[in-house]
Swiss-Prot record:
Domain of life: Bacteria
UniProt family annotation: Belongs to the transketolase family. DXPS subfamily.
Protein name as annotated: 1-deoxy-D-xylulose-5-phosphate synthase
GO biological process: 1-deoxy-D-xylulose 5-phosphate biosynthetic process; isopentenyl diphosphate biosynthetic process, methylerythritol 4-phosphate pathway; terpenoid biosynthetic process; thiamine biosynthetic process
Record's function text: Catalyzes the acyloin condensation reaction between C atoms 2 and 3 of pyruvate and glyceraldehyde 3-phosphate to yield 1-deoxy-D-xylulose-5-phosphate (DXP).
Entry's cofactor comment: Binds 1 Mg(2+) ion per subunit. Binds 1 thiamine pyrophosphate per subunit.
Entry binding sites for thiamine diphosphate: H80, G121, H122, S123, G153, A154, N181, Y288, E370
Residue sites binding Mg(2+) per the record: D152, N181
Cofactor: Mg(2+); thiamine diphosphate
UniProt EC number: 2.2.1.7
GO terms for cellular component: cytosol
Oligomer and partners: Homodimer.
Amino acid sequence: MSFDIAKYPTLALVDSTQELRLLPKESLPKLCDELRRYLLDSVSRSSGHFASGLGTVELTVALHYVYNTPFDQLIWDVGHQAYPHKILTGRRDKIGTIRQKGGLHPFPWRGESEYDVLSVGHSSTSISAGIGIAVAAEKEGKNRRTVCVIGDGAITAGMAFEAMNHAGDIRPDMLVVLNDNEMSISENVGALNNHLAQLLSGKLYSSLREGGKKVFSGVPPIKELLKRTEEHIKGMVVPGTLFEELGFNYIGPVDGHDVLGLITTLKNMRDLKGPQFLHIMTKKGRGYEPAEKDPITFHAVPKFDPSSGCLPKSSGGLPSYSKIFGDWLCETAAKDNKLMAITPAMREGSGMVEFSRKFPDRYFDVAIAEQHAVTFAAGLAIGGYKPVVAIYSTFLQRAYDQVLHDVAIQKLPVLFAIDRAGIVGADGQTHQGAFDLSYLRCIPEMVIMTPSDENECRQMLYTGYHYNDGPSAVRYPRGNAVGVELTPLEKLPIGKGIVKRRGEKLAILNFGTLMPEAAKVAESLNATLVDMRFVKPLDEALILEMAASHEALVTVEENAIMGGAGSGVNEVLMAHRKPVPVLNIGLPDFFIPQGTQEEMRAELSLDAAGMEAKIKAWLA
């Protein structure tokens, strides 16, 4: 989209943060209004993360106005809220390409801009990285400042508290800004509290605070009295005692939509020594009423008409795999009161909304705490219950030791419903489900299933749920199912594949939902087609049968080739000294960038045409 200077006259003056800092303070509220309108205009045309960015407009302007970015280093946690940051840092005219193939990255990305200090996408990493960056800056000796912005969801994760505990110990000069849009303590936001925050962040209070401690530090009772008195005075109006105990100087909560007030407070805090903590209150979706009323729905949006206030409804076609899972979960829970379902803050995405409403006492959203989610499931299994952990492939990576140490070693019957496996599309490198088969396949006692359609997905969930000899996993992709008939649930024989088509010379061993593409290739090449179904245990007898009756084998999976299902087939053949040629088709050895699922599959030769061309070239 072309930039309309007449519509955004103040924003037109800002092509960099240096130009932003030349603006008079009085013009900044107008800049915020234009920035918010431009965000609405651009994201509604292109799609993308939306409500979070609307809530951080004033904070973004204030941070870049007060701090000398990019020399001073600004770190955004997760990055959903960083669209205004991208607009103000030289990427305004490209914001319409965000999340598209070849366009701006959906999150802050080091390779895209010098303003993006840390590449992000997963949550709760900012403070840990910020401490390292602050320590490096201190050793550099150039008075470079470090700021981390983290949301109220991300700060609940253990990694964030581990980092804050460390910061309190080594005391680097850094600022952590908590962007709190839950409104849980909104009654504390007002003129009095904003005034208090500016007072507490000012030089006079800081000098008195530190000076008083030095004077009386030799008198233990008085030192303790001063400490407790300060806590009680601040505790009457602020909820920051926890952060103070971790070693931070806590300021807030303050109004995160008062850009001039934020600038005053940030200027006061900029040169304070040691770890500082600023708590701001914002409203997700600020300035666009539909998003304010329903920030979850407007968190990430398709293209839509902003004048209507409504997002386009789905076409009502085939159900998503997430819905298939959610329906199975409800169906099973209605028959078995031992079922317990766990999600790390992904209720909507994992298809668990209906379950959470029907079975609230058996639904556990543990927040952004993947490690805890898995070990919590282990505890439920020890207690005789049947836990189902619904988790995205990319987020299960964060709980790998818990899967291994707390579940698999103890042979606990935990079912992992792994959503967003394979190529996920627009969120790019940080969110592709490229590695789960590789990192799970090497774990003893793990059963791993890859459905080729929605009916098989249901049967595998049922099979895993009733498998009591250890953990099991069913991995399925983002997107819609293929439209096959759903049959009554029954347990599948563990480790057994099925031949879908008999051909000559070539056998294609398919793992998962690339089956429709593999079927087209098999038909074109008159190849045998096998639905392997299980990655672990592999159907070794079927693999050896295919090797004995065909001149060559091809394995197909939407997972990294290295260590994936195809590697397992290779291992079986080598162990039995079968020298049959094997072509492994899957995800290559690099991080898959953003683009639609269709675009990326075509680029990576994972569509039917690409697979057939690759096989023909290999056979030639």
